Regions:
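Alpha/beta-hydrolase superfamily serine-hydrolase fold, recognizing
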Residues: 2-240
Length: 240
């Protein structure tokens, strides 16, 4: 149905290491977020790598904001959320929007964000056995090169942990588990935002795997996490 200009919107950038999934494939995650927050969710069906590099992919997400602006929405009406690679994409897109002089979304929610595709971070080594599927040499590395040339892996639009957050960034909730190869990514992104004086919350759950919030919705940890998402959305979007 057509969106009313009074609606509050969640734009969702899905995970899949930039090379897998689609908006249709992740519909259950989008429905979960919508049901738990009461927001209308737009899942971005961005072009996958290698058919699209980061320059085009970030522009595709930004085009959704531009289209909503034509329909009367402002950035204050929108929360941007993403999981895994989609979490890194959401943060990278936000930095790019800021640098382009665009209004940034009211808030971000990042689930297990792949925020540094350059294999920098302690837990790429220390937690590699916790999630053996996500090995850098076999899965993440080839996906990273499909999405961005090696020289661009530390570009803030690609790996937002390298962003200059002193220039501004929306309130950001980062959630993940202790059994994730990307745990160092979460911590470094949080530290960068916190040290720059931005509003940020790091919410980590003992023993939880990658993107547990929507994939283990019946768990006590997921229920606790989504309650904090509701509070975050209420504080930074719905109370405006």
């Amino acid at each position: 149905s057509e969106l009313a200009s009074t609606d509050k919107i969640a734009i969702y950038t899905h995970g899949g290491a930039y090379v897998l999934n689609s908006a249709k494939a992740v519909i259950e995650s989008a429905m979960f977020f919508a049901a738990e927050t009461g927001l209308r969710v737009i899942a971005v069906d961005y072009t996958l790598a290698p058919h699209s590099k980061w320059q085009e992919t970030t522009d595709e997400v930004i085009s959704v904001f531009k289209e909503l602006a034509k329909q009367g929405f402002t950035a204050d009406d929108i929360v941007l959320y993403g999981d895994s690679a989609g979490g890194g994409l959401a943060a990278g897109v936000t930095i790019k929007m800021r640098d382009l002089g665009m209004e940034m979304p009211a808030a971000l929610v990042l689930w297990s964000p792949w925020a540094d595709i350059s294999e920098t971070g302690d837990t790429y080594v220390t937690l590699r056995d916790a999630e053996p599927y996500y090995t850098y040499e076999h899965v993440l590395g080839p996906s990273a090169l499909a999405y961005a040339d090696a020289k661009d892996h530390k570009n803030p639009y690609v790996s937002p942990v390298y962003g200059d957050f002193k220039q501004g960034f929306p309130p950001t909730l980062i959630q993940g588990g202790t059994k994730e190869i990307f745990l160092s990514n979460f911590i470094r992104l949080y530290q960068g935002l916190d040290q720059a004086g931005q509003t940020v919350k790091l919410d980590i759950y003992e023993g939880m795997p990658h993107v547990f919030v929507p994939t283990l919705p019946e768990s006590a940890e997921s229920q606790a996490a989504i309650a904090k998402v509701r509070d975050w959305v209420s504080e930074h979007l719905l109370d405006d």
